[in-house]
Amino acid sequence: MNNGDIRIEKIKLADLYDFACKTIANPTFKKAAPIPLIRALAQSKNPYGRPHDVVLLVAYCGDQCVGYQGLLPGLLKTEVQTSRVYWGMAWYVIPEFRRQGIGNRLLEEIKNTKIDYITPQMTASAESVFRRAGYKDLGRLTYFQLRVDRLNFSTGFFDVIITFLRKKATYPKIISSGLMRFNRLIYSITKRVLYRQAWQSSHRRQKPNLRWKVVDQIDESVGAPLNWQVKGPSFLRGVEVVNWMLKHPWLVPKSEKKTDVANFYFSVTREMFTYVAIAINSSDSRRTKGFLVLSVSKKKTKTRVKILDSYFNNPEDNEIAACLALRYAKIFLADRVDFPVSLEKYFKQMTGFKKLIKKQSHLFMFYPASSQSPLAVNIGKIAFNYCDGDTAFT
């Protein structure tokens, strides 16, 4: 096979959902479906997208889809202008066609499209491919993760026992299942005790003049300042994008999964997935304090709470985000909690948390439309956000 055998199709935003519908039960996409219906529908509603924006590159060899690269339109805000950027997502080549230049061909097609392109969160192997293709580091986002699953001390002990028992041909399987249930019980009790202590401590720190309620959408008048709370260059994430995310999630609980493509490499389901949008007011409900958006997901046996978007009229109220995140971590017995650098001190002051907190980072790589594009001239100046790109959706 040579590059002449590969054909790249560019799908525009206006055509994305119809294209996704055509991939269902289509033999061309038997081995690789470029986008599921739930994502196509959501992306077609992107408030920062335009009908003519190219949002998907599909690679074909003969009559078979062998790879794809998604593009998510976004905006870069600087002191002088707002300009368009495109976030990379869902870059994939089917196993039997890897190391044959298809991944590079997709990356070259992005260059030829002349867009300000950014890709966040990639594997080490993908990073090496991007570097060889000429993509450069844009910077790193730092955040923190509370890893309560480190307290699951008994797992290793019981694993040793179960492994030993399984070598015995006659051992009753009920023994291993009983040990696993006992391990889950111990860990569950440990989490309950830890979160109860943290919640009580956190709740005492909050002023009594506080009310909150879960809402379907964030009031635009409340969230309007979100666009400008970061000084200097940053990727715009206004309240319109937050509400789009809340209305059109990319993930659904497995129990709610409906007909969709069968061969999309990246998951569209979780054992559990939900957003929690919270409007926060003073005790008399006359004064708006701000809002908070969390996501709660369960993948296999691990439950994760993420602090996504928040805004407070008074920056000193920022700790409310941590307090409410702990409340939901307690409710769902989260194994991990992702939170921003601004809340590091708060979380480390909670009883038992300090040694469970781990610093994390995401690498952003880019390829500019030109050497003088808005993205290119702001390298080193951009403030990153945890929700940049498609992170909040996944």
For the regions a protein language model found, what residue spans apply to each?
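Active-site/acyl-donor-binding loops of N-acyltransferases
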Residues: 55, 116-173, 247-249, 253, ...
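Contiguous, function-dense segments enriched for cysteine-driven chemistry
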Residues: 52, 69, 89, 137-138
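Acetyl-CoA-dependent GNAT
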Residues: 71-78, 294-300
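Extreme N-terminal starter segment of soluble prokaryotic enzymes
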Residues: 4-6
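Conserved acetyl-CoA-binding loop-helix of GNAT-fold acetyltransferases
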Residues: 93-115, 315-328
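Conserved acetyl-CoA binding element of GNAT-fold acetyltransferases
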Residues: 82-95, 301-313
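Conserved GNAT-family N-acetyltransferase fold
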Residues: 57, 67-69, 86, 91, ...
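Amide-forming acyltransferase catalytic core, primarily the GNAT-like/NAT-type
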Residues: 9, 16-61, 83, 138-299
